[in-house]
Regions:
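Conserved ABC ATPase "signature" region
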Residues: 154-172
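The feature captures the beta-strand-to-loop junction immediately N-terminal to the Walker
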Residues: 78-80
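Helix-to-loop junction immediately C-terminal to a conserved catalytic motif
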Residues: 93
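ABC ATPase NBD coupling module
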Residues: 109-123, 147, 153-154, 268-271
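Conserved ABC ATPase signature
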Residues: 177-181, 185
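Catalytic Walker B motif of ABC-type/P-loop ATPase nucleotide-binding domains
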Residues: 202-205
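Conserved catalytic motifs of ABC-family nucleotide-binding domains
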Residues: 198
Length: 299
């Protein structure tokens, strides 16, 4: 496997704008020190219920669900159809709210992520990229910074250009439109936008969906390098077993309306449950397990 070293240049975004949740009592230049103090829970989910109503009928998706995600992990959420994987991801981002229970992100209620400056705390890569079709590449990447309305245009463009190159795209791509991009380039632009304010937490919804094998491998290599070099905590939803085993340090399995196991990949595969047996030990799972045996991953 090719090892990619990502160059993380000095940021052009003031710390007090970029990261208010991590260390609100620290001055400029100190906000990111909190990442290296000691191990901590980045996401905590406690007694979570998600109930959808359709007329007189109720569908319980999550019931008393508990989960903790520690700093520095790459945790993957897997489960069958209807187990609420993406719903849980959106709840962590504050885009949806549980029926009851608590989700805290970086020590604060996830519901507050909808407020100004959320991009400095959590970055989100949506499944199809979710780029604005009327914006150029550089305008898409810069969008979260422009929404702050606190930085001059030249600083915003400089920060966006840094992230454009950090995800492996050339400066020539800056003025292209989304309609001119390949699927792999769309993913990279969306990733650059998710990272524009250096958030400590990155959420990925099917990051390699729609990519050919070569593009998928290249994108996984990029994600692993960014996770390492930017000291990210990553939460990922994926159905792709190759991506799952290549990136995950832990896997949380959703079944029976809860997390039935949250552990390292080898322990999860050995856990006795019908979904796990079908998902991991079928022909596709066996092929992906070869990758795990070849590349034993550590943080």
């Amino acid at each position: 496997m090719t090892e990619l070293k990502v160059s993380v240049p000095a940021t052009v975004i003031p710390d007090v704008i970029r990261d208010p949740w991590i260390a609100p009592d620290r001055g400029p230049g100190q906000a990111h020190q909190a990442r290296n103090d000691k191990p901590e829970s980045v996401v905590e989910v406690k007694k979570l219920w998600t109930v959808f109503k359709n007329g007189d009928k109720e569908s319980v998706i999550h019931k008393d669900l508990d989960m903790t995600i520690e700093r520095g992990e790459v945790l993957s959420l897997v489960g069958g159809s209807g187990t609420g994987k993406t719903v849980l991801l959106r709840q962590m981002l504050g885009l949806e709210h549980p029926t009851k229970g608590d989700i805290t992100v970086l020590g604060k209620p996830a519901a507050e992520l909808g407020k100004r400056g959320a991009a400095s705390r959590v970055g989100m890569l949506f499944q199809q990229g979710a780029l604005f079709s009327a914006f150029s590449v550089i305008e898409n990447i810069a969008f979260p910074l422009r929404e702050l309305k606190t930085l001059p245009p030249e600083v915003i463009r400089e920060a966006a250009m840094v992230k454009l190159q950090m995800v492996g795209l050339s400066p020539d791509a800056a003025d292209k439109m989304p309609s001119d991009l390949s699927g792999g380039m769309i993913k990279r632009v969306a990733l650059a936008r998710a990272l524009i304010m250096d958030p400590p937490l990155l959420l990925l919804d099917e990051p390699t969906a729609g990519l050919d094998p070569e593009s998928s491998d290249s994108f996984c290599t990029l994600l692993r390098a960014l996770h390492r070099d930017m000291e990210l905590t990553v939460v990922m939803v994926t159905h792709d077993l190759d991506t799952l085993f290549e990136l995950s340090t832990r896997i949380a399995v959703l079944a029976d309306q809860k997390v039935i196991i949250n552990d390292v990949p080898k322990e999860v595969v050995a856990f006795p449950h019908p979904f796990i047996h079908e998902f991991f030990l079928g022909p596709r799972g066996q092929r992906a397990m070869e990758l795990l045996r070849e590349y034993p991953f550590t943080v």
